[in-house]
Design a protein with these regions (language model features):
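Conserved, mostly hydrophobic/aromatic
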Residues: 41, 164, 252, 311, ...
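Aromatic- and carboxylate-enriched substrate-binding clefts and catalytic-loop regions
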Residues: 52-232, 236-238
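Glycan-recognition and catalytic regions of carbohydrate-active enzymes
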Residues: 262-310, 345-353
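Carbohydrate-binding surface patches
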Residues: 293-333, 379
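Solvent-exposed beta-strand/loop surfaces of large extracellular or lumenal domains
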Residues: 339-365
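C-terminal beta-strand-rich structural cap/linker in extracellular carbohydrate-active enzymes
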Residues: 358-385
Length: 385
């Protein structure tokens, strides 16, 4: 399947307690809500909509009772056939979600029936989840028991032409080479920790470290793209980045299937969203002009389907000025750089939102000067003319 950004997903509202995974008056995965997200996806050129909480099993303590999950039976207010038909009419796909609560045997018993159903309705990607420290209340995720289970899921998905985004996985070991439908996986302290973690969220140096650690093991679904940092549920917890750094993470943290993590109302009418909608996920070439573990990272990637380049440059809690030579560009071409930078007085602690958007004619001799705020970053689109 073609790699692409799906749109924002029906899940961040649950973390903010505006919606629920389980049934009730605030249930997020409804037909109406999903169709609104599909409209948003079609409007902005996204390829899919990921929905969590659509299926039976979320009521009660689902993490402790994962064997209650059904992966084929939808809640009454989620019309799978209507939604997938509507999505197809808009050129969008529904992305499946299979949270197991760690109940591996229950999931394996339903794999063929579930994936056959999804194939029938044009669902060609599934995000899996295992929110429980043990599989079937007895085995660690990284045990032989767990490895065999994860591999069975990937192999079964391949039979039905379904790609997998695996959350709570085992340590990546290059299985994508054998199973190319394993598009990406979590296996990292991702953006969701910025919604509820008791320690306040990921510190600024986290994202300048993981490209050198977890990033070396394979694609990671970090789920960057948060635009609203206000957290009424856990006021002390929020992304310890600027908004410009959230944009830059889309390039720095590689995943061939990216997930824009925020709610659609936080994206609408924000000019910074243009970078999210323009940034590809399939790259022909990657260069790293500068990087120092835990301090700063600048990564430039060339789009596989065009002659355009995208750059993400990020810093830790220290402000930084980056001199970036564009010598990796075609020496015989001219380009237009669209620069999304930290605005005046921006900082990750109490003023994360200012973003300055500028344009500049550039070529392979250009050296860009990028000023980055504490916890900040710069995202750049370089379009060949």
């Amino acid at each position: 399947p073609k790699t692409a950004w799906p749109p924002t997903c029906i899940w961040w509202g649950m973390h903010m307690k505006k919606q629920t995974w389980e049934q009730g008056p605030k249930h997020g995965a409804t037909t109406e809500n999903t169709m609104n997200y599909i409209d948003f996806a079609a409007k902005h050129g996204f390829s899919g909509v990921l929905v969590e909480g659509w299926n039976y099993g979320w009521d009660g303590d689902w993490s402790a009772n994962g064997d209650q999950f059904s992966f084929t039976k939808a809640y009454p207010d989620f019309d799978l056939e209507k939604i997938t038909s509507y999505a197809a009419s808009k050129g969008v796909r529904l992305i499946g979600h299979n949270e197991t609560g760690g109940a591996a045997q229950n999931y394996e018993a339903q794999l063929d029936s579930a994936f056959a159903l999804y194939q029938k309705y044009g669902i060609n990607a599934v995000k899996t989840g295992y929110v429980n420290p043990l599989l079937d209340h007895k085995e660690l995720h990284g045990s032989q028991y767990g490895v065999r289970h994860y591999r069975k899921v990937i192999e079964t998905a391949a039979k039905y032409n379904i790609m997998i985004d695996n959350h709570e996985p085992v340590m990546p070991t290059g299985l994508q080479r054998t199973y190319p439908n394993l598009m990406t996986q979590e296996g990292v302290r991702g953006q969701e920790y910025d919604a509820w973690s008791a320690d306040g969220g990921n510190p600024p140096e986290h994202t300048t470290t993981i490209p050198f650690t977890r990033g070396l093991a394979g694609p990671m679904d970090f789920t960057p793209g948060t635009f609203n940092f206000n957290n009424p549920v856990h006021p002390q917890t929020h992304p310890q980045t600027t908004l410009a750094k959230q944009l830059a993470l889309a390039v720095v943290l590689y995943s061939p299937l990216q997930m824009a993590s925020d709610m659609i109302e936080n994206y609408e009418n924000n000019p910074a969203f243009d970078f999210i909608t323009s940034c590809p996920t399939n790259w022909a070439k990657t260069v790293v002009p500068e990087a120092k573990i835990g301090e700063y990272v600048t990564i430039a990637r060339k789009d596989r389907d065009s002659e355009n380049w995208f750059i993400g440059s990020i810093t830790n809690a220290s402000p930084r000025e980056v001199n970036l030579p564009l010598s990796f560009l075609d020496a015989n071409a001219s380009y237009k750089a669209h620069i999304f930078a930290d605005g005046e007085e921006a900082n990750y602690k109490n003023n994360p939102y200012p973003v300055t958007i500028t344009e500049e004619n550039v070529n392979s001799s250009t050296v860009l000067t990028l000023k980055q705020a504490p916890g900040g970053g710069t995202a750049i689109m370089i379009i060949k003319e």
